[in-house]
Amino acid sequence: MAEEPTILTPDGVENPDHDDLQFPARMEDILPEMLMVIPLYERPMFPKMMGPIIIEDMRLQKFILSQKDKKVPLFFALLLTRQDPDGQVKAPESADDFYDVGVVAKVIQISPLTIGEPLQFIVEIKARFDVVKLIKKEPLFQVEVKYWQEEKIKVTDELKAYSTAIIDSIKELVHLNPIFREGLSLLIERINLHEPGSLADFSAAMTTSSGPEIQKVLATRSVRKRIELALVLIKKELEISKLKVKISSRIEEQLSKQQREFFLKQQLQEIKKELGLTKDDTQTEMEKYENRIKDLHLPEEAQERIDEELEKIRLLGPSSPEFNVSRTYLDWLTMMPWGVYTKDNYSVKKARKILDDDHHGLDDVKDRIIELISVGSIKGELTGTILLLTGPPGVGKTSVGQSIARSLGRKFFRFSLGGMRDEAEIKGHRRTYIGAMPGKVIQAIKSCKSANPLIMLDEIDKIGASFRGDPASALLEVLDPEQNSDFLDHYLDVRFDLSKVLFICTANLLDTIPPALLDRMERIELPGYILAEKIAIARKHLIPRQMKHHGLRPSQIIISNPVLTAIVEGYAREAGVRGLETCIRKILRKTITSHLAGGLEKVRIRKRDLRGLLGRRLFAEEQVYSTPRVGVITGLAYTNMGGTTLYIESLAVPTGDSGFKQTGQLGKVMIESSEIAYSYIRFLLGDDSAAVKFFNKNFIHLHVPAGATPKDGPSAGITMACSLYSMATGKTIVPGVAMTGELTLTGLVMPIGGVKEKMIAARRAHVKQVILPKENEEDFDMLPDYIKEDLSAKFVETFEDVLKICFK
């Protein structure tokens, strides 16, 4: 019985010779009452048993080897250690860590000691004992013992019955589990089967029961009770063995059934092959690919590549790793829509109706698509076009792509370029890599099953570069009409014609798009919507869609135009309508929840309900100052969210010295514009002695409110100059005037961008008169009448023209 106890003994002498130690067999065995303790951590041992003990502790090794020359038997106490509440065993620290009953062991033979290896010796168990006193001599244990006096018992019929039951169970156990055969041989050899106590000990030791269960047998004095406990352990072991046999039989039966089915299937397959009723995998694959390419108009290069791969498959077996690689490559080659085109719609009237039904406004986009269809109707085909839709979020750039595809009668595929940093996403991976795939463009063509789909490249301004390459550079070939007729994907390695594909890209900003890529696209700006457009979109599209989404009839919840106006002005002032749709969705949810018990027959949303449904207003009412103030001028700005009003404030701090500073998170260009305005106004008022004295004696502070918002650009030049002029002269601006324009150092007013967005912001702020650069007059004239309505525009060439309009 192998044990690996941790032995605690006094320090011994140095290791003597490592010869085998054999104690005299005839020396009288005198059992000492004080013994060194060898802890057992797994199972106890029983009298009349022999087994190995392994000692790893160097001090105990020295102690044992030092006793071989004393010519006296060497005895130890073997005590089982208790387990902690988690069922774990640990090195004993006190007497409480041991059980109270153990056995005394006599050392029979010591194996030679190899340096660095544990010491192993054979022991014979002599007798049981009770622990009288356990003494810890740091860090070892000694025990004072009282040996059991084995009582002579009369073998009754009951004990005979127990003995017979144990022997029969052991025989059955050996039959079920041959591993117990050695234990049975030992039992027959060493034990008198007519001694119930010894039979109980050996049978308990044969089992795989836990240490505490076997210790219970060891510590039981009553032979009848002990043999009863041993029988329980044997029976438990027998049941476990039966369960193991049952499980093994079931598994073997399943395996045999699977093997039999496999062999039968293999035989059936071979028979079918001999009769010509089936084909091998290679032949089946070959026929599949040949049927696919039968109706395709393959270019010569693609046909040659397919023939090469088919020949490779003929030579490779299905078990070859290259077989699956070639099969995947052939799948892509043969499933591409070579020469397959969808029929285009040349009906201008039908296309216009689809575009108008799906989107309100967006006239520039609609006109460009109508022009494309008109040219196609004359030419007989629609050539590939690359459009770039730019504008703030939520104005319909992405959704308009599907409408354009429907109006043209083409398949539609969209994928986002946002965050893409790997060139292989566009041009594919080379086939040498594991898991290689074609790029997104080829995947889109295959998915659409058409060589002339509409592919939308969303968020093209958010592409990034990395060590894997620059996707924007890979797009140069895709989006160049002069090159994309021979587009080469790294995976396909065969040229594919993209010249018939209509590419539509979307972006919020143009600054992050490389100039070479931007030059290949035709730009169409989608400005923000004005109030009337937002209400029309909500009435025609957003409300019906959300009503359907929430399972409502149109008459159940009514949102009037004044309520929509209040929502737009107070909660959804962004350029697009995404925020407006979010507000409508929130109103419907809260209304359904609050009226669930009473029913939703006809609920009318009122302005006063908005605070409870949407919370407090996110935007204050935007309008110019009703009473003009010195140094405060209203400007117009263009942001990612559309147009907005921009107030410029100037303040003079009397310090006795001149100076100038700007605040409001201004960018470099805007800071330069303010310095130009400051220098020009000082020059302009150079002949005014009062103004000269004012600038010499005051520190000027120019501020642009909403200080947490970064601002940049040159278009606030004349606005800042007017603010400084107003402060220096003490004059106030004419009420209801807003302006935008770049100012040069010589007083010229230069053109600006975002005219439409700025005019929308002016109308929203109830501005009556706007001042624009003369060169933007044509931009203003091209605006729709509903934007120019109630706006009086004045066009200026110099700053002096501005002063004539603003200051009377």
Curated annotation (Swiss-Prot):
Chain segments annotated as transmembrane: none
Gene Ontology CC: cytoplasm
Localization (cell): Cytoplasm
Catalytic reactions of this protein: Hydrolysis of proteins in presence of ATP
Domain of life: Bacteria
Documented EC number(s): 3.4.21.53
Sequence ranges assigned to domain Lon N-terminal in this UniProt record: 35-238
Keyword GTP-binding belongs to the record: no
Residue ranges of domain Lon proteolytic in the record: 627-808
Gene3D superfamilies given in the database record: 1.10.8.60, 1.20.5.5270, 1.20.58.1480, 3.30.230.10, LON domain-like (2.30.130.40), P-loop containing nucleotide triphosphate hydrolases (3.40.50.300)
GO-annotated biological processes: cellular response to heat; protein quality control for misfolded or incompletely synthesized proteins
Induction section of the entry: By heat shock.
Active site: 715, 758
Cross-referenced Pfam families: AAA, Lon_C, Lon_lid, LON_substr_bdg
HAMAP family for the chain: lon_bact
Subunit and interaction comment: Homohexamer. Organized in a ring with a central cavity.
Protein known as: Lon protease 1
